Amino acid sequence: MGPDNRRILLATVLSVGILILWQVIFPTKKVPPKPAPPPAAEVAKPAAPASPAPGAAAPAVPAPPPDAPEETVKLAGKGFEATLTTYGGALKSLRLEGDKFRKQEKDREVQIDLVHVTDGQPYPLSLSASPELGGAADVAADPGARAPMRIVAKDASSVTFEGRVGNLAARKTFRVTGKPYELALDVELSGGAGNGTVGVLYPAFMPPDTKSGGIFSGPPLDFVRPVCRAGTTTERFDLAKEGAPEKLEGQVSWAGVDQHYFVAAVLPAEPIGTCTFVRGPVKGAGLAALAVPVEGGARKLSLTVYAGPKDLDTLRGYGRGFESAIDYGAVAKFFALFARGLLYVMRWLEAIVRNWGVAIILLTVLVRLVLFPLTYKSMQSMNEMRKLQPEIEKLKAKFGDDREKMNLAVMQLYQKHKVNPLGGCLPMLLQMPVWFALYAALQTSVELYREPFLWMKDLTAHDPYFILPIAMGISSFVMQKLSPQPADNAQAKMMLYFFPGFFTVIMLFVPGGLTLYIFVNNLLSIVQQQLMMKHQQAAPAPAAGK
């Protein structure tokens, strides 16, 4: 195989790597099937107040609200404000505090709320008894989960509800613990008979037309999924799909809802019970149910509720595999360890310079320094190839259209002068794992969410004015221009124009932090190459030999 063909082969390999990166960044849009319209009789007929019989289908319309008027209580914790409701004695809203935890909603910015439910769904942390304990067979449509409870005690940091769950008396106390984004929940069940289970419910709703990822964007901030850690496996539940309930194997360490940079979950004191994902009662709705065994009609539970950002150190502090709430994706998960390493380095740099954009620039410099011995040898090889260009032109004139003989002669020329024609591609190959890892860090690390740099308001979002991608494309073109060109003119044009253009199009909608890294890396490569060319300019070109 000739040297030019080898360059094209390696370029093709790089293109495949870029295409893989494209698939990671821009996953295929999931288009859920259109829901079938409900029968006319069900639309006109009001919902019956009685619970559905065991084994009956889920109702197509939301259950009616409780008759008793709703009361709410607000608890202010460290970094959040929780609103608790008497409907189920549960969590109606949990808003994160601070300018960082805001999102754009239509024409205004609002605080991020980690509760996502729709009409007919229970609220997070409501309870549902199994049929053996007087509850409903379909937990997703159980009206008892929103049954009114009464407030029996409250102060600035706690509230206690009392009511019934199936045929059990229930007492639920929520307390602010003083830790960031944390509540404590104590549950006491009594007064029943027999054995069964009581589910601690964490529901979620996402409009069926929500994109899980499109051609030009990753998942939106409000892309939510019920999630559960059972045994040693963390599973996420796709609300866009239809199907029967899914029960996970193994005792449950935590269960809740995953929302991109955030997680809201309930953690028992120790692994217990089972976890089931259940769909309904409407399209796009579902829940994770932590089913806890109840024997003799009584049970006490001490639960921790965490609802906040996916800070790696914080999640690790809880143990129980809680750090697996950070989802690196199918491909990027192979770079998860590397991504965490990059994040720790960037956090250290940001603590010094107090700007995440500058920290990414300094990270680029550090990576270049680490890879300098390899990139130096690679650029030496490129410069040696450039010196041989006059001899290659002579070979092109000598052999004309006989490409096989020309490639053989060029390869012999490279061997004679100990030049590796593939050496120039080594720097990009070495950088690709860094790109994947940095992309994974940008997509999963809340530290970089809404962090500005220059004209960009958020380094985890794409450049709104496309300045960086275009600048990156120009710098890639300059790098190709400085590199030795293949002997074949068509191949030379493809290397010079196609790859920078193709790469620019891909980078238009990736996170600005990744584009910044690649742009700065290109600039450093250009400067290094220019300095080496000036340093070696005085050296005589190697003779072709006789």
UniProtKB/Swiss-Prot annotation:
Bias type Low complexity, positions: 41-60
GO biological process, one term: protein transport
Transmembrane segments: 8-28, 326-346, 356-376, 422-442, 459-479, 498-518
Chain segments carrying region Disordered: 31-70
Alphabetical keyword list: Cell inner membrane, Cell membrane, Chaperone, Membrane, Protein transport, Transmembrane, Transmembrane helix, Transport
Subcellular location: Cell inner membrane
Listed GO CC annotations: plasma membrane
Entry annotated with the keyword GTP-binding: no
GO molecular function, one term: membrane insertase activity
Pfam families per the UniProt record, alphabetical: 60KD_IMP (PF02096), YidC_periplas (PF14849)
Record-linked InterPro entries: Membr_insert_YidC (IPR019998), Membr_insert_YidC_N (IPR028053), YidC/ALB3/OXA1/COX18 (IPR001708), YidC/Oxa/ALB_C (IPR028055), YidC_ALB_C (IPR047196), YidC_periplasmic_sf (IPR038221)
Keyword 4Fe-4S (UniProt): no
Subunit structure: Interacts with the Sec translocase complex via SecD. Specifically interacts with transmembrane segments of nascent integral membrane proteins during membrane integration.
NCBIfam families per UniProt: yidC_nterm, yidC_oxa1_cterm
Stored HAMAP family: YidC_type1
Name used for this protein in its record: Membrane protein insertase YidC
Gene name tied to this protein: yidC
